[in-house]
Amino acid sequence: MSLVARTGLIVVFIILGTGHIGAQTATLSGDLLTDWQTQKRTMLAIADAMPEELFGFKPTDAQRTYAEQVLHIAGANVYLMQHLAGGVEAPAVDTTDFSTFGLEATSKAVVLEALAEGYDYGIAVLQEFSDEELVATVSGPRYLGEVTRVRMAYFTLSHAMDIYGQMAVYLRLNGVTPPASRRGGV
């Protein structure tokens, strides 16, 4: 192999190795915060996709309205993230009302504001913790028991995605394509 070819290979390995080192600097807290912020944008987009006049739509009498689905996420985010035992003051929610957590849908703007506030609270809480603190155990809700902070945060994210799936159906039943489907999905 010529000197030029060997030098070229060495340069390629150095570049690849440097990229790998950069990838190793990711942190649990950084990844979790990124996931939370990404989900905030995703949920605000799907919440905003429904026209305001259809915020009262529900597929059956037994289900929540579209606005109530959004408020459920907003309130659940606050309720669940309070279990991380952070020092940030939480927005007021009624923890005896697991449907909307006492939040009311007086307008689309109010609903979207509540959703953003719930996510902003989660962001503020997550910013308090280091990687080591995220793996510490806290008391979760009774149905989870003792959990790590990171599990509690990811449980909260997965709960919201469950509701996202329901909201996508609400949109399609009203002829609206969910935002993620407009851009080709995942």
Predicted segments with their positions:
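Bacterial N-terminal signal peptides
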Residues: G8-H20
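Boundary at the C-terminal end of the N-terminal hydrophobic targeting segment
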Residues: I21-T25
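Short, contiguous alpha-helical
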Residues: L33-Q37, R41-L44, L54-D97, S139-V186
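Well-ordered alpha-helical scaffold segments within catalytic/enzyme domains
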Residues: T42, I46-D48, M81, Y121, ...
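Surface-exposed helix-capping loop/turn segments at secondary-structure junctions
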Residues: A49-G56, V125-V135, L173-P178
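Acidic/histidine-rich alpha-helical segments that form the ligand environment
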Residues: T100-G140, T148-H159
